[in-house]
């Protein structure tokens, strides 16, 4: 963070440990004299000592939790040298630090246990293989309407330019809202307003990735997976958790989800995005420009038929707009990450699909009676 430590990068475990120690020492200062003997205060003293690695004097003077400037060795002459404690006031200057400390503790950001080999889109590719010719590619939906109790979808073959119509008992619409708002439909006004509100709430997310011809973050800095955070525009650098100790590797050189920064990066040329990401990465890893190669960027707001990374409804829209989409419009049902409280996650899309299928099955059974 440019606002703290003179802009020098810091190891997360050190800052986390010193934050806990500094906060625990402040809290311990509020204990009543003689807390060692009294019941509740004695228990609180024990809690704070364990939480913050405080000494018997209830002060924080650094901890092995923060790591070592010189790691412990084998002989009595090599006990290891701990890092000195970072001043709590200096830690507090880092504007990005609150979100960093809480990130891994939020309910949807637990430590990753499994990941699909080949990238997250491996899941979509597996569905495509299973469905085979059922999928019609290059088919652009241009209209959705009710025809009695059924639905009619109008679509255009993008390769041949020909128009087509498909009638169905039910339609599961997973089209992202920024795209859906421009498709002709006979949805009622509350549904159209909800679609428009959601379309405005999409995050213009941006990612930048680089290839590295050697895994210098492992060999030079002992980084094996994980994330570096920065107050600069790139927001994060992700280090690969696969292919450890290999020859080459792919770094995620930027992951941007702040609307203003995302729009600014989206307006850049691909070449300019790479240059901006390298300049910011240089602050974390001096010599970065010579360590990365073959960059690529994706600005989701620029991707056709997507219009953004994911929706971020926010409390007002959750209450005012989202409910209008929950029950769909007759035979038309909506599904996707935007139809869940797990926005941006594939799990949200899958759960919403399950819910829609259950509603369709229930409706089909009621018709059969």
Model-derived features: positions:
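FAD-dinucleotide binding site
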Residues: 1-369
């Amino acid at each position: 963070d440019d606002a703290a430590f003179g802009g020098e990068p810091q190891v997360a475990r050190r800052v986390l440990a010193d934050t806990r120690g500094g906060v625990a020492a402040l809290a311990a200062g509020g204990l009543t004299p003689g807390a060692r003997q009294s019941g509740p205060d004695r228990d609180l003293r024990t809690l704070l000592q364990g939480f913050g690695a405080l000494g018997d004097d209830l002060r924080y003077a650094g901890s092995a939790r923060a790591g070592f400037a010189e790691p412990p060795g084998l002989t009595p002459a090599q006990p290891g040298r701990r890092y000195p404690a970072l001043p709590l006031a200096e830690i507090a200057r880092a504007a990005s630090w609150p979100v960093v400390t809480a990130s891994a503790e939020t309910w949807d950001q637990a430590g990753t246990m499994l990941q699909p080999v080949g990238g997250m889109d491996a899941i979509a590719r597996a569905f495509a293989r299973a469905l085979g010719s059922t999928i019609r590619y290059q088919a652009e939906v241009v209209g959705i309407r009710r025809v009695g109790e059924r639905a009619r979808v109008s679509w255009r073959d993008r390769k041949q330019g020909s128009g087509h119509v498909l009638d169905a008992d039910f339609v599961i619409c997973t089209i992202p809202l920024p795209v859906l708002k421009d498709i002709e439909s006979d949805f009622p006004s509350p549904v159209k307003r909800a679609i428009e509100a959601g379309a405005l709430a999409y995050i213009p997310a941006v990612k930048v990735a680089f290839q590295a011809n050697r895994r210098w973050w492992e060999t030079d800095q002992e980084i094996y997976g994980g994330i570096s955070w920065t107050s600069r525009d790139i927001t994060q650098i992700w280090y690969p958790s696969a292919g450890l100790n290999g020859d080459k590797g792919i770094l995620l050189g930027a992951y941007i989800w702040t609307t203003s920064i995302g729009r600014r990066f989206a307006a850049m040329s691909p070449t300019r995005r790479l240059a901006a990401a390298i300049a910011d990465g240089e602050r974390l890893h001096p010599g970065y420009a010579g360590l990365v190669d073959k960059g690529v960027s994706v600005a989701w707001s620029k991707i056709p038929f997507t219009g953004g990374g994911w929706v971020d409804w926010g409390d007002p829209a959750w209450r005012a707009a989202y409910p209008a989409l929950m029950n769909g419009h007759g035979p038309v049902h909506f599904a996707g990450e935007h139809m869940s409280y797990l926005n941006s996650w594939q799990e949200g899309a899958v759960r919403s699909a399950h819910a829609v299928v259950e509603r369709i099955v229930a409706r089909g059974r009621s018709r059969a009676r």
